[in-house]
Amino acid sequence: MSALTSAIAAIDSLHTIPPLTADDEWRSIGASLPDHLTLERITEDMHERAGLVALLAFLKHTHSTSTRQQPEHAAASAQKLCEHVARIIAPCPDSEAGQVSDDDYPEYEQVAHRSRDLAPYGLAVLRILCNDYSINLDVDTLLTVISFTAPGLTDPWTTQGACHVARELLSQQLLHRLDQSDLLESILKEYLRPAFAKSRPQAVTASGRKAEFPQDDDPHRGLADDTKEVKPWKYEDHRAIAVFHWVVLTADSDVLKRLWPLFIPVLLALLDDGTTRIRRRGLLILDSFLEKFPSNILRDTGLASVFRDAVFPTLHFLPSITPEEDSILLLEAAYTALLRLARKTESKAGKVEPHGTSPKGKLLDKLLREGVFSSYFHVKEHVKIVAVLLMQTAKILDEMQIYAVKHLKDLIPMHSEVLSNPFAALAPATLSAAIQGLQAVIANCWPRLSIPAYQDELIKALVVCYMTVHDERDQLGERFAELDVELVKTASMLTVAAKGTAGKGAEDLADKAALLVSKEPLLAGLFQ
């Protein structure tokens, strides 16, 4: 039995493994390991979690005592051990452990669970080895560390503790690299470009620029190309997306300006993928990318239309074809990215264009017509998705401002239908979104709200909603007060908007409100 095997057997006999912060307990375990255990022998005989635990205990013990003497070439063994530990904890199917065959790949969740189980111990080992032996990690090991640093724990293989250790370790390693932009360029060229080479969409050329004459996509191509040969980043190396996300978050505008062609194929491949988690991650990354990407390059290269065409299909990922929860995740991310794109497509400085013909104006109009209104027609019975659409509508209107008046004929009926629904109190989140959406309509389109037809429909919607909310006061519980305040605020905004037209609208609204209050005194609380 080898030294490490003996140590592993001792670890396996433990009922529980102590927390990583319990240094004294770890040193106690380390003290019980065989005296002849060395880094060289550990490197030769590594094994899964028990091996990582034994290694961690060994390192914590040797870190606090000088009884174990390491040979002069221990640093080389430590470097080799770092690479081996990184391979073990990486969120990749483990061919060495016999998990992968040509026709049988483990599920993504299975790989993520295994990596999540091993990562806390492996990352702790890497941190100790790097500190004790002043190791500069090789790029592949660094990629594994990066894959555990995603913000918001968006990857299922990382935890809060693992993320903290990985970020700390990464920060230390980056201090040893004189030019971080060189590392980013190396990752983009030598790691990400080969991984995504076969899954590049037809909309861009191999150099990442807009294709002037793109080939028509085969509708069946997506299924045929969804393989490990075409998408190794999806099936063979789950680090790739997390690493790309880190590159986008880390790169400054100068790096993006110089290396942008290397980003585009990866972004479009993610946006084109049919798996919800990947497409959504691509949308989140695109939003971060656009935030820093120079507007002039976006405009002059034609990439704005490429991104628009890549994201827009996601707006139609709706039930019943797409599960409701998946649809919500995708819609929120897609609208956020498209709104960011609209803000970045302002006309050139000094160039005055009518709103309807400007790139930003056309995109916002398209978002409402082909996005919100089209989707609402199909998903009225899915109240959670309706809430998302209403919240995004408010954001779009705030971007359009007065130019949103052209859409009043669709905006007012959509909001009125939700507010007037007798069962609206059953979905308070959707009701709240409709009220806030109507506030955005009033705030941006107030000059046209003196039109009697619009005014009557809005008053009716507010009155019906106010009565419903008060009738269902007990059912709404804590949400009642919030909804009541927002409804009163909306009615007040409508009154102010009517006064702002400097016409007969204000008097008409006051007369209508007084008549309603005379018939139902409860409405005095609405029209204060």
Spans of features found by a protein language model:
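Intrinsically disordered terminal tails
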Residues: 1-16, 22-33, 37, 74, ...
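Short coil/turn segments at helix-helix junctions and helix-capping linkers
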Residues: 42-46, 109-117, 153-161, 227-236, ...
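Residue-level signature of the C-terminal ends
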Residues: 32, 36, 58-66, 88, ...
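HEAT-repeat alpha-solenoid elements in large eukaryotic scaffold proteins
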Residues: 4-11, 47-66, 114-129, 160-170, ...
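Non-catalytic protein-protein interaction scaffold segments in large eukaryotic complex-forming proteins
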Residues: 12-149
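Core helices of alpha-solenoid repeat scaffolds
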Residues: 4, 22-33, 74-82, 135-146, ...
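Alpha-helical repeat/alpha-solenoid scaffolds of the HEAT/ARM/MIF4G superfamily
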Residues: 90-128, 132-244, 298-306, 310-330, ...
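Glycine-rich flexible loop motifs, especially short His-Gly-Gly/GGXG/HXGH segments used as catalytic or interaction
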Residues: 2-46, 50, 76, 143-157, ...
